[in-house]
Amino acid sequence: MEERMDRRIAQLALDRFRVDGFVGTSIADLAGALGVSKAAIYYHYRSKDTLLHRLIDPLLDAIDAGIGDHTTPAPTPRQLLSAYLTVLLTHRDVVPLIATDVAVLNHPSIGPRLRAQNQQLRTLLTGPDASVAARLRAEAALGAIWRPLIAEPPLDLTDRAHQHTLVDAAVAALRPSRSSPDRRLVAAAQSARTPSGRR
């Protein structure tokens, strides 16, 4: 019974946070919707922050585990982005909350962790000394994975073919265009190493 109430509170909190925002939802709102006292909510969760962590931490833990699994040996971008998408799809119900609620993004114990994970993912995609252009492409690739998960109306990503399409798009975002500064620098360096490029 207690475990069932715990899950009911968490599910209601997720629904309310997504509609009214974390800041706009109170413990009193949750208690009223469930027809219980605030004390009954506090019996299961010490605070609204505790509830938020109950919802968000499984996703953050899974991202940390996924990053850890893909550091040695270094993954290909496709392997990393595919694994990242799998984690996000597993926890898709909380992705919109993280992606759209400023209070959650700036939460003192959640925001820094999200930013650190994003930095780790960028570094795995580009290397530690990447150019600004490469970092921008990495951000675009990560956005290509995130954004479709919060599209309205929701997109069907249960089909493996759709997931492959999404990963293909993210990998493509990592490739420099012909006019990219990175490509011009590489071409200049290669030219300098040829006999015609030597002084």
Language-model segments: residues:
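Helix-turn-helix
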Residues: 8, 12, 16-50, 54
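Solvent-exposed, amphipathic alpha-helical segments
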Residues: 12-19, 62-70, 144-148
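Short helix-capping/turn signature of helix-turn-helix
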Residues: 45, 86, 100-104, 143, ...
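Hydrophobic alpha-helical connector segments
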Residues: 54, 65-96
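Secondary-structure edge/capping motif, primarily at the C-terminal ends of alpha-helices
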Residues: 70, 98, 102, 152-153
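Helix-loop "lid/cap" segments that line or gate small-molecule binding pockets
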Residues: 82-89, 100-104, 124-127
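Hydrophobic/aromatic-rich alpha-helical bundle segments in the mid-to-C-terminal region
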Residues: 95-96, 107-118, 125-199
